[in-house]
């Protein structure tokens, strides 16, 4: 008798994706972040659903409805903080996942990679709109500043901004539509993630050496299901430590003040996971130039397959490229720090140097290093 999990139309899909999937025998813990992102997404959708049951998307009541969730709803505070800090965990996993892809040359799976580049954009849009919903000071001013960037687009910029706002400033219409988009986007992200997996399973996973693992495959279950569960436990442990002991560690105190269009906060800054891009935006004195640099800072990932000059796929056996990769990581941490600092000396010049460094490393130095490594091996 044939096994139902291999014959049933629905079970067959699950079986081929998570049970009998042939996986490389040597993939390290850096390959855990895909499943962790899936867990994060499910967690965000569930906590978000329960928050939406008590939230009102209206400028007059949004702030007080969030207060009501925290004070009066049974375990509302834990749901709210799990959702807020869950976003931070989501981005930590996202950065690790992309970093893994860059280090081990996973971007050579073109379709998987290109769908994967769309995912951070969708996630960032979702997180930005979610940050606006509590209608605190940083929500309002963050929404005003970031949506205003679109006015840098020639000819249509101003009309576009007013169209997004639904008026002449960030107001009730803006909040309502942001709530609608914030609700729908995670489901679009889930659909894109399924397409991402579909393309990945066409080729099979990469592995740390970057060589073909067709001759040495093991079933996904039980080996990687167990390995993923360890990752999930560590993720939940970290999340709950944040939620229960330091729920506001990564937030902004300004967001505990209700939105006031007549009072601008001294330092307008986004959540920590946008700071690197915000620093790049601020480092260019021209508005349109800054917006282009901001978009390119993430869109540059699309160019990675074109910039790959090495005869080897992975950086595992390429020490010069490894050094440049870790310099890039340090540079991104520097940009994250600068993005949270006020616009004054010496932060301005540090931000500009770090921004130049970021693009130079990716567009110039890493391809040169790859070519040098090829020559050293007489390839």
Curated annotation (Swiss-Prot):
It is found in: Mitochondrion inner membrane. The chain crosses the membrane at residues 33-53, 77-98, 113-133, 178-198, 226-246, 288-308, 320-340, 347-367. It is a multi-pass membrane protein. A ubiquinone binds at residue 201. InterPro entries: Cyt_b/b6_C (IPR005798), Cyt_b/b6_C_sf (IPR036150), Cyt_b/b6_N (IPR005797), Cytb/b6-like_sf (IPR027387), Cytochrome_b (IPR030689), Cytochrome_b_C_euk/bac (IPR048260), Cytochrome_b_N_euk/bac (IPR048259), Di-haem_cyt_TM (IPR016174). GO terms for molecular function: metal ion binding; ubiquinol-cytochrome-c reductase activity. Its main location: mitochondrion. It holds the Pfam family Cytochrom_B_C. Heme b b562 binds at residues 83, 182. Keywords: Electron transport, Heme, Iron, Membrane, Metal-binding, Mitochondrion, Mitochondrion inner membrane, Respiratory chain, Transmembrane, Transmembrane helix, Transport, Ubiquinone. CDD domains: cytochrome_b_C, Cytochrome_b_N. Binds 2 heme b groups non-covalently. It comes from the Eukaryota. Its cofactor is heme b. Heme b b566 binds at residues 97, 196. Belongs to the cytochrome b family. Heme 1 (or BL or b562) is low-potential and absorbs at about 562 nm, and heme 2 (or BH or b566) is high-potential and absorbs at about 566 nm. The cytochrome bc1 complex contains 11 subunits: 3 respiratory subunits (MT-CYB, CYC1 and UQCRFS1), 2 core proteins (UQCRC1 and UQCRC2) and 6 low-molecular weight proteins (UQCRH/QCR6, UQCRB/QCR7, UQCRQ/QCR8, UQCR10/QCR9, UQCR11/QCR10 and a cleavage product of UQCRFS1). This cytochrome bc1 complex then forms a dimer. This is Cytochrome b. It comes from Raphicerus campestris (Steenbok).
């Amino acid at each position: 008798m044939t096994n139902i999990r291999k014959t049933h139309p629905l079970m067959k899909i699950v079986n081929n994706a998570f049970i009998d999937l042939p996986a490389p025998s040597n993939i390290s813990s850096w390959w855990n972040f895909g499943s962790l992102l899936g867990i994060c997404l499910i967690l965000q959708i569930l906590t978000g659903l329960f928050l939406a049951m008590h939230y009102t998307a209206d400028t007059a009541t949004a702030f007080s409805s969030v207060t009501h969730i925290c004070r009066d709803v049974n375990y509302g505070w834990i749901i709210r903080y799990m959702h807020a800090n869950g976003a931070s965990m989501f981005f930590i996993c996202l950065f690790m996942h992309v970093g893994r892809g860059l280090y081990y040359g996973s971007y050579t799976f073109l379709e998987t990679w290109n769908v994967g580049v769309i995912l951070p954009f969708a996630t960032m849009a979702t997180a930005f709109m979610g940050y606006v919903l509590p209608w605190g000071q940083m929500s309002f001013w963050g929404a005003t500043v970031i949506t205003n960037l679109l006015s840098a687009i020639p000819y249509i910029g101003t009309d576009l901004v007013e169209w997004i706002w639904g008026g002449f400033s960030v107001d009730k219409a803006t909040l309502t539509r942001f709530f609608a988009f914030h609700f729908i986007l995670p489901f679009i992200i889930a659909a894109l993630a399924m397409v991402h997996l579909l393309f990945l399973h066409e080729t099979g996973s990469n592995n740390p050496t970057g060589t073909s693992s067709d001759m040495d495959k093991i079933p996904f279950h039980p080996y990687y299901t167990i390995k993923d569960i360890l990752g999930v436990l560590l993720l939940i442990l970290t999340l709950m430590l944040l939620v229960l002991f330091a729920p506001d560690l990564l937030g902004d105190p300004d967001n505990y003040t209700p939105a006031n269009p007549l009072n601008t906060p001294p330092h307008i800054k986004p959540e920590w996971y946008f700071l690197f891009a915000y620093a790049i935006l601020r480092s260019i004195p021209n508005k349109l130039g800054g917006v282009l640099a901001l978009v390119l800072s993430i869109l540059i990932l699309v160019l990675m397959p074109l910039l790959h000059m090495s005869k080897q796929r992975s950086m595992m056996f390429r020490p010069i490229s490894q050094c440049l990769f870790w310099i890039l990581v340090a540079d991104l941490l520097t940009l994250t720090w600068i993005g949270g600092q006020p616009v004054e000396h010496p932060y301005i010049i540090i931000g500009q140097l770090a921004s130049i460094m970021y693009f130079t490393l990716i567009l110039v130095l890493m391809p040169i290093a790859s070519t040098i490594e090829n020559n050293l091996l007489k390839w």
